[in-house]
Amino acid sequence: MTLALSGQKVLVFGLAKSGVAALRLLRQQGADVTALDARGEDALGAVAHEVKALGATRVSGPTPPGLLASQDLVVVSPGVPLALPEIQAARAAGVAVWGEVELAGRMLSGVPLFGITGTNGKSTTTALTGTLFASGDKRTFVGGNLGRPFSEAAMSPGDWDALVVELSSYQLEGIRTLRPRGAAILNLTPDHIDRYPSHAAYGEAKARIFQNQQAGDFVVVNADDADVLGLARAAKAPVYGFSLTGKPVADAPALAGLAVVEPGGFRLAFLGEHYTLTNRALRGAHNAQNAMAAALLARLGGVASGAVQAGLDGYPGLPHRLESVRVLDGVEWVNDSKATNVDSVLVALRAFSQGVWLIAGGKGKGAPYAPMVEAGQGKVKGVLTIGDDADTLARAYAGAAQVHACGTLAHAVARARELAERGDTVLLSPACASFDQFKNFEDRGDSFKRLVEAL
């Protein structure tokens, strides 16, 4: 679909990655674009030069009065709250306000879209779903909140047979007509409390993923999550569930089909199909949930069962999420740098039965570490502490496991090499932010991988 954007006055609010991608798309379509970002030229760096090269007008600093209301369309980046007074004033003046995802979706309305949201597991499920569709010989775009902005797909709409898109609550706030063929909500736990006044409001933002669906579409939900099932009651399309227990929570809406974990894998009971999960990149109960959601999206989206199994077997995993770096002298080294809070470490620990040397620490978030200590009973041999919160971690683990104060990641890796025995696992799962010693969790994970590869 081609929108009539040529010559239209369009303002892009926010010049992070999604905003810049929207700007490129709008200029490709011939729109007269103004780019608004509070940051000045020095802070924007190369982005400021690209805005100029694309022939757009850049406005920095406070929003000039009346600027938004003078536009034909305002496209808002996900990080910009729609509750801002200037955005509300533009809406009151009759100006259309879309998120970047809505803009791209309108230009891709002829391509089946499979959207994935939830608090945790979105990126893994999105990447895995993309792998399953590609395994079925579908020309598949994978992106959205993960990796490539959705607008990049709209630059060449004829290139795609399927669109697999991670959608954050922020992105879903900005949709109006977006209609996924398949919509998945993986889970719902408290998050983004700075943006939403309540957990219910956060859930309402997530539920927008299926607001435009019709009976010919489908919804995939976590049948073990009461909050998610509550949202699914409003769905117009058939609802399919996935479950670790095989017993959806009480008062669940009627399910059109269920995926259930069983020894060695899972089954899609309503299709009579069994899938094996032997891929190390998909270890752990949380990844069984991700795999079931991805398989439901793929099978209901037209991918053959054999291609789904091949995709599950061949999925390479995402960096920094229980990523197996190497096995050295019988010891596996695992990079889970994405685990920046206690809950994420609990998920990681469930993937191992014994012999874990845990590297943890960094900039703490104030949460108690007691749940980690309890979850590690009988499986964590020792903890190697790093970063600002090392002392707090050491106190939490005192008497429960060996504690080795290492300070730096390099020291922790070297000490773990001395301590770990054949059959053990050295797990970097920090439970903390990385900003005390690294640029971000990716930098921390990459540093860990370099250190391990150098052993």
UniProtKB/Swiss-Prot annotation:
Query: In its keyword annotation, does this UniProt entry include Nucleotide-binding?
Result: yes
The record's section on Pfam families has: Mur_ligase_C (PF02875), Mur_ligase_M (PF08245), MurD-like_N (PF21799)
* One GO-annotated biological process of the protein: cell wall organization
Q: What class of enzyme is it?
A: ligase
Catalytic activity field: UDP-N-acetyl-alpha-D-muramoyl-L-alanine + D-glutamate + ATP = UDP-N-acetyl-alpha-D-muramoyl-L-alanyl-D-glutamate + ADP + phosphate + H(+)
| InterPro entries found in the cross-reference section | Mur-like_cat_sf (IPR036565), Mur_ligase_C (IPR004101), Mur_ligase_C_dom_sf (IPR036615), Mur_ligase_cen (IPR013221), MurD (IPR005762)
What cellular-component terms does GO give this entry? cytoplasm
Top-level taxon in the UniProt lineage: Bacteria
Q: Indicate yes or no for the key word Cell wall biogenesis/degradation.
A: yes
Q: Where in the cell is it found?
A: Cytoplasm
Q: State the pathway, as annotated in the record.
A: Cell wall biogenesis; peptidoglycan biosynthesis
Q: Which family does it belong to?
A: Belongs to the MurCDEF family.
**HAMAP family for the chain:** MurD
Which function does this protein serve? Cell wall formation. Catalyzes the addition of glutamate to the nucleotide precursor UDP-N-acetylmuramoyl-L-alanine (UMA).
The protein's name is: UDP-N-acetylmuramoylalanine--D-glutamate ligase
Species this protein is from: Myxococcus xanthus (strain DK1622)
Tell me what gene encodes this. Answer: murD
